[in-house]
Amino acid sequence: MKKNLTLFAVIAVMFATLLTGCASAPQFETEAESAQRPILIQGPMPIEAEKFAQRLDKVKVEKSGTFVFYIGKLDKYPVIVAKTGKGMENTAAATAVAIEKYDPIAIINQGTSGGHDPSLNVFDIVLGERTTNIGSLKTGHLEENEGIEPTNWIPMDLMASEGSAGEDPNAEKARYYEGDADLLAAANAVKDKYTKGKVVKGTIGSADVWNNEVDRINWFHENYGTSVEEMEGAAAAQIAKAYDVPFLGIRVLSNNKTNGGQYNPNTAEANQDYVYEVVKQYISKIHEK
């Protein structure tokens, strides 16, 4: 009888240990998953964000102010799509909120853009080897009734110092934010999967200005080296730089006034499809580490 009780006790302990192991395994996996820093994908308008969000698994939606965050998984890795709203201020705020709240491992700002380079066509995609604020400008000194001279305006680097940029001679230049090398490598690795246009490296210009003057567009292209313009990327790049988060802008041409390329709204979905492949490639490299 004593032997039977001893045997029963041993079996009970083994069974309890087995149950504990089974229960702790999912818990360990959950803790491991929660330790993964998400990739943040930004899109300004619904047409530029929601298609990507629909392709995520296990999505939950969170809001902060007017900003919407679609939190899900891609290839079992955490990815967040942020619908930031249009413009530099919205994007800067949404980027800061996302970094503080979600601690992303990398940020991709993507969407549509207008062409500055006449060699680029609608549906072509520009990888932001550089991103710059083309709305930060300093005018010349002219008195009343002396007119305005926009072509004589010069860049103003607000980040050159903590003091007044208007009085700082070192601030009279454009600031370029470099695209992250690993994100660029991922984008280049899958560019042959994009068949609706070509994928090139270039300079993305951003400002809260909608330029319809071709001579003005050409001026930016010549003086800043811009490939395209939009209204968000440089703001996101500036905040990402402040927090030391890897950043890349990816923009598709939805129109190009320099060569007559007409607006096509389908470019927004095409760009999201390409960025989806970029993110999958980037995740595969994370898994290899």
Pin down the residues of each PLM region:
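N-terminal short beta-loop-beta anion/metal-coordinating cradle
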Residues: 26-96
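Bacterial N-terminal signal peptides that target proteins for export
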Residues: 1-9
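C-terminal motif of bacterial Sec signal peptides marking the signal peptidase cleavage site
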Residues: 19-21
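A C-terminal functional module that forms or caps the active site or interfaces directly
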Residues: 207-249, 258
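Mid-sequence, gly/pro-rich, charge-dense loop/helix-turn segments that line enzyme active sites
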Residues: 117-221
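Proline-aspartate-enriched helix->loop->beta-strand connector
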Residues: 103-105
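His/Asp/Glu-rich mid-to-C-terminal helical/loop segments that flank catalytic regions of hydrolases
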Residues: 257-289
